[in-house]
Protein backbone atom coordinates (compact mmCIF):
# COMPACT_ATOMS: atom_id res chain seq x y z
CA UNK A 1 0.00 0.00 0.00
CA UNK A 2 2.85 2.36 0.89
CA UNK A 3 4.31 1.98 -2.58
CA UNK A 4 0.93 2.49 -4.24
CA UNK A 5 0.03 5.62 -2.30
CA UNK A 6 3.44 7.31 -2.35
CA UNK A 7 4.51 6.60 -5.89
CA UNK A 8 3.82 9.19 -8.70
CA UNK A 9 3.34 10.99 -12.95
CA UNK A 10 2.46 14.56 -13.71
CA UNK A 11 4.41 17.63 -14.33
CA UNK A 12 1.91 17.98 -12.02
CA UNK A 13 0.60 21.01 -12.11
CA UNK A 14 -4.12 27.78 -10.50
CA UNK A 15 -1.31 29.15 -9.08
CA UNK A 16 0.49 27.95 -5.95
CA UNK A 17 3.42 29.70 -4.34
CA UNK A 18 6.60 27.71 -4.65
CA UNK A 19 7.95 26.75 -1.25
CA UNK A 20 11.64 27.54 -0.98
CA UNK A 21 13.60 24.37 -1.74
CA UNK A 22 16.39 23.28 -4.03
CA UNK A 23 14.15 21.48 -6.50
CA UNK A 24 10.53 21.12 -7.54
CA UNK A 25 9.20 17.58 -7.45
CA UNK A 26 5.78 15.95 -7.62
CA UNK A 27 4.78 12.37 -6.94
CA UNK A 28 2.14 11.24 -9.38
CA UNK A 29 0.13 8.15 -10.23
CA UNK A 30 -2.77 7.22 -12.47
CA UNK A 31 -6.06 5.96 -11.08
CA UNK A 32 -8.12 3.62 -13.27
CA UNK A 33 -11.70 2.91 -12.24
CA UNK A 34 -12.32 -0.70 -11.19
CA UNK A 35 -15.45 -0.48 -9.02
CA UNK A 36 -18.13 2.18 -8.83
CA UNK A 37 -18.29 5.28 -10.97
CA UNK A 38 -16.59 8.61 -11.45
CA UNK A 39 -18.69 10.33 -8.78
CA UNK A 40 -17.65 7.85 -6.09
CA UNK A 41 -13.95 8.06 -6.92
CA UNK A 42 -13.93 11.85 -7.16
CA UNK A 43 -15.73 12.17 -3.83
CA UNK A 44 -13.42 9.61 -2.22
CA UNK A 45 -10.24 11.33 -3.42
CA UNK A 46 -11.53 14.71 -2.26
CA UNK A 47 -12.32 13.29 1.18
CA UNK A 48 -8.85 11.72 1.44
CA UNK A 49 -7.02 14.82 0.17
CA UNK A 50 -8.94 17.16 2.48
CA UNK A 51 -7.95 15.05 5.47
CA UNK A 52 -4.36 14.04 4.70
CA UNK A 53 -3.06 16.19 1.82
CA UNK A 54 -4.46 19.69 2.44
CA UNK A 55 -1.14 21.56 2.53
CA UNK A 56 -1.45 22.28 6.26
CA UNK A 57 0.81 21.33 9.18
CA UNK A 58 3.76 20.63 6.93
CA UNK A 59 1.92 18.32 4.54
CA UNK A 60 2.20 18.69 0.77
CA UNK A 61 -1.04 19.37 -1.09
CA UNK A 62 -2.55 16.74 -3.39
CA UNK A 63 -4.48 17.28 -6.62
CA UNK A 64 -6.64 15.23 -8.96
CA UNK A 65 -6.94 15.64 -12.74
CA UNK A 66 -9.22 13.89 -15.22
CA UNK A 67 -7.31 12.64 -18.26
CA UNK A 68 -9.19 13.65 -21.42
CA UNK A 69 -6.80 12.46 -24.14
CA UNK A 70 -3.83 10.17 -24.64
CA UNK A 71 -3.10 6.54 -23.74
CA UNK A 72 -4.81 6.86 -20.33
CA UNK A 73 -7.87 8.83 -21.45
CA UNK A 74 -10.81 8.24 -19.14
CA UNK A 75 -8.57 7.71 -16.12
CA UNK A 76 -7.35 10.14 -13.45
CA UNK A 77 -3.97 11.49 -12.41
CA UNK A 78 -3.33 12.05 -8.71
CA UNK A 79 -0.36 14.19 -7.70
CA UNK A 80 1.10 15.48 -4.46
CA UNK A 81 3.65 18.26 -4.19
CA UNK A 82 5.86 20.09 -4.32
CA UNK A 83 7.51 17.50 -2.12
CA UNK A 84 11.02 16.39 -1.14
CA UNK A 85 12.69 13.00 -1.04
CA UNK A 86 13.14 13.40 2.71
CA UNK A 87 9.34 13.46 3.08
CA UNK A 88 9.38 9.76 2.22
CA UNK A 89 11.20 9.05 5.49
CA UNK A 90 7.97 9.76 7.35
CA UNK A 91 5.94 6.58 7.63
CA UNK A 92 2.25 6.83 6.83
CA UNK A 93 -0.07 6.24 9.75
CA UNK A 94 -2.39 3.27 9.84
CA UNK A 95 -5.34 5.63 9.66
CA UNK A 96 -3.91 7.28 6.54
CA UNK A 97 -3.45 3.96 4.78
CA UNK A 98 -6.90 2.72 5.79
CA UNK A 99 -8.50 5.95 4.58
CA UNK A 100 -6.83 5.55 1.17
CA UNK A 101 -8.06 1.97 0.94
CA UNK A 102 -11.64 2.93 1.85
CA UNK A 103 -11.95 6.11 -0.22
CA UNK A 104 -9.65 5.62 -3.21
CA UNK A 105 -8.38 2.07 -3.65
CA UNK A 106 -11.94 0.79 -3.21
CA UNK A 107 -12.84 2.38 -6.54
CA UNK A 108 -9.63 2.48 -8.59
CA UNK A 109 -6.38 0.73 -9.45
CA UNK A 110 -3.28 2.89 -9.11
CA UNK A 111 -0.44 2.55 -11.62
CA UNK A 112 2.27 4.53 -13.40
CA UNK A 113 3.93 5.90 -10.27
CA UNK A 114 6.58 8.55 -11.00
CA UNK A 115 8.67 11.09 -9.11
CA UNK A 116 8.62 14.08 -11.49
CA UNK A 117 11.52 16.52 -11.03
CA UNK A 118 11.45 19.87 -12.79
CA UNK A 119 14.38 20.76 -15.03
CA UNK A 120 14.78 24.49 -14.39
CA UNK A 121 17.20 25.10 -17.25
CA UNK A 122 14.72 23.80 -19.80
CA UNK A 123 11.67 25.32 -18.08
CA UNK A 124 10.10 28.64 -19.06
CA UNK A 125 7.78 29.77 -16.28
CA UNK A 126 7.20 33.57 -16.40
CA UNK A 127 4.57 33.70 -13.64
CA UNK A 128 6.43 31.26 -11.36
CA UNK A 129 3.40 28.98 -11.21
CA UNK A 130 3.75 25.55 -9.70
CA UNK A 131 0.39 23.87 -10.34
CA UNK A 132 -1.96 24.41 -13.28
CA UNK A 133 -5.68 23.67 -13.13
CA UNK A 134 -5.76 22.64 -16.79
CA UNK A 135 -2.66 21.27 -18.47
CA UNK A 136 -1.47 19.77 -21.74
CA UNK A 137 1.18 17.20 -20.96
CA UNK A 138 3.48 16.08 -23.76
CA UNK A 139 5.64 13.05 -23.05
CA UNK A 140 8.74 12.40 -25.11
CA UNK A 141 10.22 8.90 -24.62
CA UNK A 142 13.83 9.17 -25.77
CA UNK A 143 15.54 6.34 -27.61
CA UNK A 144 18.32 4.59 -25.71
CA UNK A 145 21.77 6.07 -26.21
CA UNK A 146 23.49 9.25 -25.05
CA UNK A 147 23.41 10.76 -28.54
CA UNK A 148 19.61 10.53 -28.55
CA UNK A 149 19.34 12.08 -25.08
CA UNK A 150 21.62 14.99 -26.01
CA UNK A 151 19.78 15.65 -29.28
CA UNK A 152 16.35 15.82 -27.64
CA UNK A 153 17.65 17.90 -24.74
CA UNK A 154 19.12 20.43 -27.16
CA UNK A 155 15.84 20.69 -29.07
CA UNK A 156 13.87 21.26 -25.87
CA UNK A 157 16.46 23.74 -24.62
CA UNK A 158 16.38 25.81 -27.81
CA UNK A 159 12.61 26.15 -27.53
CA UNK A 160 13.08 27.43 -23.96
CA UNK A 161 15.60 30.01 -25.18
CA UNK A 162 13.20 31.17 -27.89
CA UNK A 163 10.36 31.50 -25.38
CA UNK A 164 12.58 33.65 -23.17
CA UNK A 165 13.79 35.84 -26.04
CA UNK A 166 10.25 36.46 -27.25
CA UNK A 167 9.02 36.98 -23.65
CA UNK A 168 6.14 34.63 -24.23
CA UNK A 169 3.24 34.75 -21.79
CA UNK A 170 2.74 31.00 -22.15
CA UNK A 171 4.57 28.78 -19.67
CA UNK A 172 6.24 25.48 -20.45
CA UNK A 173 7.49 23.46 -17.53
CA UNK A 174 9.82 20.53 -18.15
CA UNK A 175 10.02 17.45 -15.94
CA UNK A 176 12.13 14.30 -15.80
CA UNK A 177 11.48 10.98 -14.12
CA UNK A 178 13.81 10.85 -11.09
CA UNK A 179 14.02 7.06 -11.40
CA UNK A 180 13.64 6.17 -15.09
CA UNK A 181 12.69 2.61 -15.92
CA UNK A 182 14.30 1.80 -19.24
CA UNK A 183 14.68 4.78 -21.55
CA UNK A 184 14.46 8.37 -20.34
CA UNK A 185 11.30 10.43 -20.74
CA UNK A 186 11.05 14.22 -20.89
CA UNK A 187 7.64 15.61 -19.99
CA UNK A 188 6.53 19.06 -21.17
CA UNK A 189 3.70 20.66 -19.18
CA UNK A 190 1.73 23.52 -20.72
CA UNK A 191 -0.96 25.16 -18.56
CA UNK A 192 -3.99 26.49 -20.43
CA UNK A 193 -7.14 28.40 -19.47
CA UNK A 194 -9.56 27.46 -22.28
CA UNK A 195 -10.01 24.61 -24.73
CA UNK A 196 -10.38 27.26 -27.43
CA UNK A 197 -6.59 27.60 -27.27
CA UNK A 198 -6.35 24.32 -29.19
CA UNK A 199 -8.28 25.62 -32.20
CA UNK A 200 -6.10 25.72 -35.27
CA UNK A 201 -2.71 24.00 -35.03
CA UNK A 202 -1.64 25.30 -31.63
CA UNK A 203 -0.70 22.50 -29.23
CA UNK A 204 0.84 24.19 -26.23
CA UNK A 205 3.31 26.62 -27.80
CA UNK A 206 2.16 30.18 -28.62
CA UNK A 207 0.38 30.76 -31.92
CA UNK A 208 2.96 31.76 -34.53
CA UNK A 209 5.83 30.35 -32.45
CA UNK A 210 7.42 28.57 -35.40
CA UNK A 211 7.85 31.90 -37.21
CA UNK A 212 9.29 33.48 -34.06
CA UNK A 213 11.68 30.54 -33.65
CA UNK A 214 12.92 30.84 -37.22
CA UNK A 215 13.50 34.58 -36.86
CA UNK A 216 16.01 33.65 -34.17
CA UNK A 217 17.57 30.48 -35.57
CA UNK A 218 17.01 30.83 -39.31
CA UNK A 219 14.52 29.74 -41.96
CA UNK A 220 13.63 26.07 -41.80
CA UNK A 221 15.30 25.68 -38.40
CA UNK A 222 12.15 24.63 -36.56
CA UNK A 223 11.60 21.58 -38.74
CA UNK A 224 15.29 20.69 -38.78
CA UNK A 225 16.10 21.32 -35.11
CA UNK A 226 12.83 20.31 -33.47
CA UNK A 227 10.50 18.21 -35.61
CA UNK A 228 13.19 16.18 -37.39
CA UNK A 229 15.16 15.72 -34.15
CA UNK A 230 12.16 14.39 -32.26
CA UNK A 231 11.31 12.10 -35.16
CA UNK A 232 14.84 10.66 -35.27
CA UNK A 233 15.70 10.49 -31.58
CA UNK A 234 12.43 9.75 -29.76
CA UNK A 235 9.72 7.11 -29.90
CA UNK A 236 7.02 9.68 -30.64
CA UNK A 237 5.15 12.19 -28.50
CA UNK A 238 1.94 11.57 -26.54
CA UNK A 239 -0.53 14.36 -25.73
CA UNK A 240 -2.52 14.22 -22.51
CA UNK A 241 -5.00 17.00 -21.76
CA UNK A 242 -5.82 17.01 -18.06
CA UNK A 243 -8.49 19.06 -16.29
CA UNK A 244 -8.46 19.48 -12.52
CA UNK A 245 -11.23 17.93 -10.44
CA UNK A 246 -12.07 20.18 -7.49
Could you tell me what each predicted segment is?
Residues 20-246:
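Short S/T/G/P-rich N-terminal loop/turn motif that feeds into the first structured element of a domain
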Residues 1-23:
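Bacterial Sec-dependent N-terminal signal peptides
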Amino acid sequence: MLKRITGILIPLLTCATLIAQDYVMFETQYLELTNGGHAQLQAGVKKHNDKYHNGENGTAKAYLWYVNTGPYAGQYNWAVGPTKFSDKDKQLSGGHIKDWENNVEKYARSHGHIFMMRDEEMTYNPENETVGENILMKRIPIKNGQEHVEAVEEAVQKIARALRRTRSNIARRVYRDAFPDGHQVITLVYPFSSWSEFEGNVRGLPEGFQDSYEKIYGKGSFRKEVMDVLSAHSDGVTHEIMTMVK
